[in-house]
UniProtKB/Swiss-Prot annotation:
It catalyses: an acyl phosphate + sn-glycerol 3-phosphate = a 1-acyl-sn-glycero-3-phosphate + phosphate. This is Glycerol-3-phosphate acyltransferase. Keywords: Cell inner membrane, Cell membrane, Lipid biosynthesis, Lipid metabolism, Membrane, Phospholipid biosynthesis, Phospholipid metabolism, Transferase, Transmembrane, Transmembrane helix. Pfam families: G3P_acyltransf (PF02660). It comes from Campylobacter lari (strain RM2100 / D67 / ATCC BAA-1060). HAMAP family: PlsY. The chain crosses the membrane at residues 5-25, 58-78, 87-107, 118-138, 150-170, 176-196. GO terms for cellular component: plasma membrane. The keyword GTP-binding does not apply. Catalyzes the transfer of an acyl group from acyl-phosphate (acyl-PO(4)) to glycerol-3-phosphate (G3P) to form lysophosphatidic acid (LPA). This enzyme utilizes acyl-phosphate as fatty acyl donor, but not acyl-CoA or acyl-ACP. Pathway: Lipid metabolism; phospholipid metabolism. It is a multi-pass membrane protein. GO terms for molecular function: acyl-phosphate glycerol-3-phosphate acyltransferase activity.
């Protein structure tokens, strides 16, 4: 029962739509009705930038940080209280699932990139550093957020087999692949636009 409560909390906290809330509170804008209609930092930047470019950058950065922390903090708290990595990895997956399929938004949500990066940073810090470098380079060259995110995810998966061929305690890369699958699934419209060379440049 205790584990079920922890899992539920990880999901519900991960489901908090910080991007949507920040845009509504500070920019008086409903990002669910504009841009890509996603609740993530990229859409916050895209939509709010039309009326207030400076505020857009601030809110986008805040969204990234909060979306990452909502996955990280529950895991760190559970780790502090002695829960093992099997439970912590399950919490990580549920946090990303909550962000992407939020019960507060009729099970819609964001793309899971910031939350996924946050939870994976707890377990795979070196891999996340490599992924962030890839995200920065791809974003700088192509200026397409979705392409940078997908490229970074590929780098993370590849480097996870280099730095952690056997994931400690759980001895499987399954949670990483589940998180990656969720992120790719939420990026399907972006992937189709990338193939059709219609994806918008943002970063």
């Amino acid at each position: 029962m205790e584990n079920l409560i922890i899992y539920l909390l990880a999901y519900l906290i991960g489901a908090i739509p910080f991007g949507l809330l920040l845009a509504q509170i500070f920019a008086k804008t409903n990002i669910k009705n504009a841009g890509s209609k996603s609740i993530g930092a990229t859409n916050v930047l895209r939509v709010v930038k039309e009326s207030n470019p400076k505020l857009a950058k601030t809110l986008a950065v805040a969204t990234v940080i909060l979306d990452a922390l909502k996955g990280v903090l529950p895991i760190l708290m559970a780790k502090f209280y002695g829960f093992d990595d099997n439970i912590l990895w399950t919490m990580a997956v549920l946090a990303v699932f909550g962000h992407c399929f939020s019960p507060y938004l009729k099970f819609e949500g964001g793309k899971g990139v910031a939350t996924g990066a946050g939870v994976l940073a707890v377990f795979l810090p070196f891999e996340i550093i490599c992924a962030l470098l890839a995200w920065f380079i791809i974003g700088k060259v192509f200026k397409i957020s979705s392409l940078a995110s997908l490229g970074a995810m590929i780098v993370l998966i590849a480097t996870s087999f280099i730095f952690h061929y056997d994931i400690p305690v759980i001895n499987t890369h399954a949670p990483i692949f589940i998180i990656a699958f969720i992120v790719v699934y939420k990026h399907i419209p972006n992937i189709l636009r990338l193939i059709g060379k219609q994806e918008c440049k943002v970063i």
